[in-house]
Amino acid sequence: MKVLVYPPNSLILADLVERFGHEPVVLMKEVAKHVRDAEIDAPPLNITEEDIKRSLKYVSVEEPAGLKGRIGLLAPLLEKAEASIILTDAPPTYGCMGCAVANELFKFLIRKKGIPTLEVRYEGGEKMEEMVAKIKDFLERLRKQEQEAHEAKKEGIGESGEREAV
């Protein structure tokens, strides 16, 4: 399952997601595409026309350019995500986003999407084990749900729980 991690540039969360058999949906992959894009003059500082068009699906044209640029870059992550983990109150070492308005809007868009989401508060110190345990439990539940859905599909059982005609 594709799991969006927030902050989307958190290597620590991305590693946890990968260790539990899911695909992390992270900002680094999106930036990598831009760095290799011939359309961009000074990667990764510039954004493309497509980024701006994509951002207009989520924000008004009157919003500041910085917000549109950030949301345009983050939008593909949101569109790919099948589940998400939001780490709140994390220190900048977990992945600084740089713009509070873009942060809040992006978290709102994740919640609005209606995908399975775990919101866990960063507390540090000895509470880290609890945080990692919550993330582990969430990822294991996702794996189990994914396997059950796969088995049901294999047996020809639809989402309603009834056997479908094959």
Locate predicted features.
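An N-terminal assembly and electron-transfer interface module characteristic of large anaerobic redox
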Residues: M1-V166
